[in-house]
Amino acid sequence: MEFTEYNDIVKGWVQEVLDNHQKDAELTLKYCNDIIEYADRTDDAKLLGFGYYYIAEVYYILNDGDSFFATVSKALSYLEKAGEWELIARSYNILGIIAMNRGNLPIAYDYYLNGLVYCRKLSAPEVEIIIKINCGSLNIQGRQYGEAEKFLYEALELAKRLPKDKTYHSYMVCIYQNIAICLVLQGKLEGVDGIFRKVHTDHWQEADYLDKIGVLCAETLYYHRSGSYELRDECIAHIDGDVGNNIAFMDIFDDLYTYCELLLECDKDKEFWNIIDTLEPMIRNFNITNMQLKEISLKIKYYRKHNQNAEYLQAAGLYYELSERREVETRDMIN
């Protein structure tokens, strides 16, 4: 978005929002409200859309789903009127992520596809890459592997055109990781080692910490399925050594969920509980029912495997209660 037509005060507010929206919620809300108050007086759809979008983003970061939905709805109406396609696409991407986290894949898919419609009106590919990666991940969860590969390879071709900066390397790591997982889950193991070699050779040094953990989770699955148990255990040791570092693992929750299922399969009980004990307080803080259900389902599998009947029954009861809550949340999301 360009703001050259506005006075210095408004441009200052806008810059404060852009500088602080990912690190200072209070300041971001203050300047967004200043922008909205000014825009209300001047009936400026562009500024109203901008202000409400970044307030919605703050609510998303704070995991206030209800406030996010109410605010992003206001943002979308103004952004549409102003023709600000990039923020509309970003809004639909966040809506898709929230729906996906809540376990409603069809609604998430609709949001992502709506976002891609607006991406076609943009010359910058970054938002389209993000949404196509998310579509690939969603289709992997839904076991629609052909569709997943289509989205991921489209994202790969777009990412190859970007400047070779840190963002480029992060996209490439994420895309290759998801392609590898997609192939392994289909039993297509040939060539997957080459994908991981490319990640380590071309992108590893510039990758973010969480990107690396995600890749290690994928490598663990690959080495287990290919019978390379020594290499599998090396990856497990790397991940286990980082579990207690107070890192925001919620960003790779689905990777860690699949990883925990694998730990159960290969009797890595200590490492399994290290992950669970790290994730549990974060999941409670986020208060996302679908994540709580997934965590409880892992415990149920563990208790059943080890014949811990009392713990199994208690966890099963909690799972039932959470399932009922998710049904209500799904109805509310649809309505």
Listing of model-derived features with the role each one plays in the protein:
Residues N33-D40, S73-G83, L113-A124, Y153-K164, ...:
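Amphipathic alpha-helical segments of tetratricopeptide repeats
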Residues N7-D8, K46, E86, E126, ...:
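Residue signature of alpha-solenoid helical repeat architecture, marking inter-repeat boundaries
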Residues K11, F50, A70, R90-S91, ...:
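Residue register of alpha-helical TPR repeats
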Residues F3, N7-V14, F286-N335:
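Hydrophobic positions within repeat-based interaction scaffolds
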